[in-house]
C-alpha cells in the first residue's frame, strides 16, 4: 500500500515492518524517516537544495559525503563509495526528475554518539529535479557489523531484515503528487 509523504505531496510503497519515526520523535520538515521495527535499518527521504554546481553523477557522491559528515564518518577509512550508477527512467515512477542515481557505499558510524562504531552499508538514490531547485535523496542504512560495545548489540537476531530489493521497491515507487511541496 502506498504511504503518503510530506503531507501527501509524495508517496511511496514501503516494506512491511516499517515504523514512522515521526510518531516517536521530532523530525526536520525536509525529512521523512522510517525504521525497521526489529532491526537498526532505516530509510530516510530528504528534500534538499539542488546542487547546480555538481554534475549529475557527482551529485550522488556529494550528498553521500555530506551524510558521512553528519554521521561523523569523515576521517579517511571511515567511509567508502563502492559504485555510482544511473537509474534508467523506465525503472522509476518519479518521471519529473531529470535523472536518478544509485550509490552504494559504507560508513563506520556510532549510534547516539557512542565510542563503538558500527559498519553500515549505505545505499542512496538521488532524484534530481532542477525545475524545482530540489534534489530528493533517499537513503537506506543497512548495518552489517554491530560492534559488541554498541547499544545496538542486543538486537533481535530472529528479525527478518529488509533487503536491497526492498529498498529498490521503495525508490521505484516514489511518486510526486503535488509540486507545491517545493515552495
UniProtKB/Swiss-Prot annotation:
Region (Interaction with RAN): 23-66
Transmembrane spans: none
GO biological process per UniProt: atrioventricular canal morphogenesis; heart contraction; heart looping; protein transport; regulation of heart looping; regulation of heart morphogenesis; regulation of membrane depolarization during cardiac muscle cell action potential
GO CC list: nucleus; perinuclear region of cytoplasm; plasma membrane
Alphabetical keyword list: Cell membrane, Cytoplasm, Guanine-nucleotide releasing factor, Membrane, Nucleus, Protein transport, Transport
Major subcellular location class: nucleus
GO molecular function, one term: small GTPase binding
Coiled coil: none
Annotated compartments: Nucleus; Cytoplasm, Perinuclear region; Cytoplasm; Cell membrane
Metal-binding among keywords: no
Membrane topology: Peripheral membrane protein
Pfam families: Mog1 (PF04603)
InterPro entries linked: Mog1, Mog1/PsbP_a/b/a-sand
Record note on disruption phenotype: Morpholino knockdown of the protein causes bradycardia and weakened myocardial contraction. Expression of hcn4 is decreased, and this may be the cause for the decreased heart rate. Morpholino knockdown causes defects in heart looping during embryonic heart development, probably due to the decreased expression of cardiac transcription factors in the anterior lateral mesoderm.
Subunit comment: Monomer. Interacts with ran.
Family, per entry: Belongs to the MOG1 family.
Role, per record: May regulate the intracellular trafficking of RAN. Promotes guanine nucleotide release from RAN and inhibits binding of new GTP. Plays a role in the regulation of the levels of GTP-bound RAN in the nucleus. Required for normal expression of the ion channel hcn4 and for normal expression of the cardiac transcription factors nkx2.5, gata4 and hand2 during embryonic development. Required for normal embryonic heart development and normal heart rate.
Protein name (database record): Ran guanine nucleotide release factor
Species in which this protein is naturally found: Danio rerio
